[in-house]
Amino acid sequence: MTLDELANELCAVSDEKAVRDLAKYIEEWKGDDRNAEVLENMVERFFGNVWISKEAEHSKAYRLWSSFRDDAIHGIGGMTMNERLYAFGLFERFDSCKSEAERLEVYGKVHAKP
């Protein structure tokens, strides 16, 4: 599952504002300078502090997140740069970088070295 698929799947699980806000936060992460570890911490904090009213929806949303987290974030060390860009939906951003500094920011987001 990619980050984009995760955001879409979360919206399909529940129509609660909190879940839509989480999906939006996940999408916005792609455009800022925070790395995958920060993403993990923020989403885990969300699930620890925000309750989705229906237990089944909460459980499914957390299972989706856990699957992505375990595969993409915890497995990031075994991925090539292209696999990281794909998993985190960052191909377009990486390809549109106009400077080395912008590229280094993307490398940092996915814990990669140029």
Where are each of the predicted segments found?
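C-terminal-biased regions
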Residues: M1-P114
